[in-house]
Amino acid sequence: VDAAELASLLTEMYVAKGMSEHQFPLTAPVYIRAKAVQTTAYGQEIEGTSITSNVITLNKVYLLFSLPPVKTPEKLYLVGSFNKWSWDNALEMIPVNGSPNIFWHLVYLDGEGNSAGVKFNSDKAWNGNEAGFEKITINPASDNAADIINANGNIGSSKAGWYLMIVECTVVGRDIKYNVTFNKPNVYLQGVCTAAGGWDLIPDNLFSVPATADGEFVSPAIGNAVSGGPSGSDPGVRICVKIPNADWWKAEFIVYDKKIAYRGNGGDQTPRVAGAVGQKVYLNFTKETGEIK
């Protein structure tokens, strides 16, 4: 028996009984039985040849905590009625710059019908780790906390529409906990390209919000022409959402080649993208597409 494998198995047994990491190391008896069986030349068990030993007692086994540390997920993916519950085209949530345990995305939530709502997971799979309504804690400080309902185990809304969904992941013991904020779906045109030409998040810079899951968010008209350019100091079209207690640029994004490109944990998004006076930005967050025209 591989010693590391046995130590891991024993640790899992004690954790399942309610013990926590700080209670290790410990000394405990271990009871083992050995099994022998004849096999064919191809490794197949020969029926009727199995034999099991008496119980072997190891009276004092010194056991260190032998499970790997639990970490917050590096990625989160969203599925739901908006994409027919397909992991193949799941939305990847965006990490807040400098806060790799916090993710966000604009998402359309509904609450009616057996397939309503959304779930999220750190893998693109139905593997038992997906989080629905019962696996999240709704942040009471959310703009729209009262709208969120249990939609057949999924995360749904009593008022179908768009939400800025922010998931904060923390480790408690051996479990990952999800504190989820559901804010207004505010998307801002930002910076020099706006009519005001400033960096404050003001109502005049808000995108309009569509009524459907496949609709487009539309910006106000660009008020100042921006030339774009290869460096971060060049003026360009910039867009963001606002994450509580974070600077605006920590949740910014832009449109490249008709696709939404998120900054995430990256640096300045270059090259900057040009925009002419009167043009608007059109964004589809279900398809992750965009256009400036």
Segments predicted by a language model, with ranges:
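Insoluble glucan recognition modules
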Residues: V1-K293
